[in-house]
């Protein structure tokens, strides 16, 4: 990481956290909840872990690489426009559109290669997850960690 930056240059990690979480119990037992869990499981089986199990290590990796002035912020990205707050509602709407437009692509390789599903099984599951993503009664959100740090001005 450090070798590609000039001294004093910054590196930032940000990622969409899976599995998603909920501010209440409305996510429990849904296809949306299952989707996040299965995506992480499939990625792990393919040797490419993803989601919060990776993003929780960003700070540690930056420290190990010698970065300084490391900062961290955690955001909540709603799964759809369920929040009452105007800004969060708009963010949720854009997030919902993003997920719906990419859902099949996100799932197909991971679920067929990582979990051994047939394409038809993925299609059925994607339809269920899509319905949950549109359901404003499910108060889900994706953790969105952002971690950044600076390459030292001089070598340690």
List PLM regions with ranges.
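A short glycine-rich, Lys/Arg-flanked "PGG" loop and its adjoining helix->strand segment in the class I
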Residues: 1-10
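C-terminal lobe and adjacent flexible extensions of AdoMet/dcAdoMet transferase-like proteins
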Residues: 65-156
